[in-house]
């Protein structure tokens, strides 16, 4: 997209923030694409050293002044809210996010601890898993506020990602 803007002669300074593996993203998959980004961007910001290292794979000139790591942050909790016996899973309901492991595990847990419940927030139309239990509640995709409200009720949040998670925002939340 940056190259498109440059070709259109857009006079602006570009700052890119990478929060996923750049080698899997259109416009930064190849060494030449990434070298063009270095040349044409004022700053490149990465959410972790891992993401930055991936970006520079195969590139000799690192341009340290243009490239920085800024870790995502949260506001510290001053008072922990009273929690319920709820285990939460939030995210896409697919294999890369580990939903297949969560689903089979949560059924065993809910069978053993009948006073616990689990909520699942998210969806995934491309993959279908059918985990059912009377204490397993699917909420679908919710707004950020509703998701955070449910997080505040849950005692446990599970993030079993199966891919190279550059910086799991779900775990941070």
What are these regions (language model features)?
Residues 5-24, 44-45:
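Active-site proximal beta-strand in glycosyltransferases
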Residues 122, 127-148, 156:
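Nucleotide-activated donor-binding/catalytic signature segment of Leloir-type glycosyltransferases, i.e.
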Residues 21-22, 50-51, 69-79, 125:
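Short beta-strand->alpha-helix junction loop in the catalytic core
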Residues 152-166:
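Acidic donor-binding loop of glycosyltransferase active sites
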Residues 27-66:
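A short, active-site helix/loop in glycosyltransferases that binds the activated sugar's phosphate group
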Residues 5, 87, 99-114, 123-125:
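Short hydrophobic signal-anchor/transmembrane segments that target glycosyltransferases
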Residues 45, 74-97, 103-107, 119:
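Conserved donor-binding/catalytic core segment of Leloir-type glycosyltransferases
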């Amino acid at each position: 997209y940056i190259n498109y803007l440059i070709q259109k002669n857009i006079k602006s300074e570009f700052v890119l923030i990478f929060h996923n593996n750049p080698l899997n993203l259109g416009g930064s998959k190849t060494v030449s694409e990434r070298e063009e980004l270095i040349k044409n961007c004022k700053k490149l910001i990465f959410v972790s050293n891992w993401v930055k290292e991936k970006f520079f794979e195969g590139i000799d000139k690192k341009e340290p002044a243009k490239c920085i790591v800024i870790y995502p942050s949260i506001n510290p909790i001053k008072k922990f809210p009273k929690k319920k016996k709820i285990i939460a899973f939030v995210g896409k309901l697919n294999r890369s996010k580990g939903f297949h492991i969560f689903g089979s595990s949560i059924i065993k847990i809910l069978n053993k601890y009948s006073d616990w419940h689990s909520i699942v927030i998210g969806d995934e139309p491309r993959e279908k898993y059918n985990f059912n239990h009377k204490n397993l509640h699917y909420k679908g995709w919710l707004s950020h506020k509703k998701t955070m409200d449910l997080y505040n009720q849950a005692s446990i949040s599970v993030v079993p990602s199966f891919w190279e998670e550059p910086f799991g925002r779900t775990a941070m939340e």
